């Protein structure tokens, strides 16, 4: 499957560029989606999927051979 980043995803991920290790983990998790777009640690969120990667959440959609990364956010502790 192909992976595409929306402009919003690029903008939201850019806020966390100082966390190089976190960005490497996010990159590895997103690349793994090409092999398995529905890993057991991802959850349905309406028409999106959400994937927790350390302190981050990746929101993405899967459609017709394309995975679109919609946003990357830091998860707040509750």
What are these regions (language model features)?
Residues 1-3, 29-30:
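Short hydrophobic/aromatic-rich motifs at helix boundaries and adjacent loops
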Residues 2-3, 14-15, 20-23, 53-57, ...:
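Enriched for short, Lys/Arg-rich terminal
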Residues 5-9:
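Basic, amphipathic "hinge/linker" alpha-helix immediately C-terminal to the N-terminal HTH DNA-binding motif
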Residues 27-52:
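A short, surface-exposed loop/turn module that caps and links secondary-structure elements
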């Amino acid at each position: 499957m192909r992976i595409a980043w929306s402009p919003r995803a690029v903008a939201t991920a850019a806020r966390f560029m100082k966390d190089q290790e976190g960005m490497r983990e996010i990159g590895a998790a997103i690349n793994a989606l090409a092999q398995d777009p529905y890993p057991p640690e991802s959850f349905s969120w309406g028409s999106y999927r959400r994937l927790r990667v350390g302190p981050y959440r990746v929101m993405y959609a899967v459609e017709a051979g394309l995975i679109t990364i919609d946003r990357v956010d830091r998860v707040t502790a509750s």
